[in-house]
Amino acid sequence: MLNRLITSHKSLITDRYKKLYDAYIGDYPILHQANKEAYKPDNRVVVNFAKYIVDTFNGFFIGVPIKVSSKKKEIDDYINLLDKYNDQDDNNAELSKICSVFGKGYELYFNDDYGNLGITYLDPREGFMVYDESTVQKPRYFVTYQIVDEVMCGYIYDKTYKYEFNDKGGLHVFDGVEHGFNDIPATEFIENEERMSIFESTYSLINAYNKAMSEKANDVDYFADAYLKILGPKLEESDLVHIRENRTINFESMDGSGDGIVVDFMSKPNADATQENLINRLERLIFQNSMVANINDENFGTSSGIALRYKLLSMSNLAKAKERKFTSGMNRRYRVLFSNAITHRSENDWLEVEYKFTQNYPANLLEEAQTAAQLSGIVSHETQLSFISAVEDTNAEMERIKKEDENDMVETENRIFQNNEDSQNDEQ
């Protein structure tokens, strides 16, 4: 069965994941088309919308790191230690990017060489999850493998053991060792329920855009190298040795008189307006179908407040949908991690973990401060502070305000006491 699963996974890599990754790094089909004749313009222009869409969306979705916390101090302290030890803010950002490129990604948990819990991310080319056939589709195995010196080697994880395998001299699966978790130490994170890349629905549009831009560049070269047409006089053979190189065409008049001489450039019909319309329409459709805002649009920078939020509404809705999927994955992350004995935590402590996602809107501190001020007396001070993007941690800010108020009160009491003493001294 393992051989069959790996063969199926390799086919998926070839048929789908390679295409998606190539698009992200700017390697599109137009770069691999057959070359045209040497004398014809043959530009290959690539506009990498796939990377722009992925990076722009993830900057909006997770550019502000996810705040993971718990109201129980001992759990909160451990989460902060665990996430800092594993550089989890960066891991989350990379995992989110992987999901946007491929439609899904994986996290793997392990005991590292220092006796601490390790967390790493994998893209779907490096492994796969096997689910059971129940209604809820629970994970049964996680498989990760690589090819080293033409030998495939990897690991299989179930709920208790980790098994090493390789195909040197045939497929061999070795005895398992306990991995220390009460469940499969891996989690699948998904971009959406369909596990589609964020730019997958626009892939054909991006290819069409690249083709249109390349043809437009070819037309520019064509007009720059237009043939000189000379009608009437007969040119000497020595002048026309290399017609294509010199780009000259000579048609001698029928009577050889040379009358009615015409000298101008030959050009094909100009389709510039049609090309521009096509390019502009393709660009609009790419952003419309991906639901990611084109923040480089000239009209985008002039928007503010509610108008800006309307322009980002589609991307905000997309981010909220991904937030729910990411939250599900993070719930499983901490449930599995807390099941390891070295954490000294209860497996159900993950129920006390809370997540705060902050969409990365351009900040207008003046508007935010005015909104917060207008809410005075209507909502709590903590809620007021949450409207100001410059305040990253409302609880910490409330503590600082409390300390400042206490210090101000002490200073006021000291001044009153000092003034009373001075008054008494003056009376004496």
Q: Residue spans of the language-model regions?
A:
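Extended, helix-rich architectural segments
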Residues: 1-117, 417, 423-428
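Short, charged/polar micro-motifs that form catalytic or ligand-binding hotspots
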Residues: 97, 265-276, 316-323, 374-375
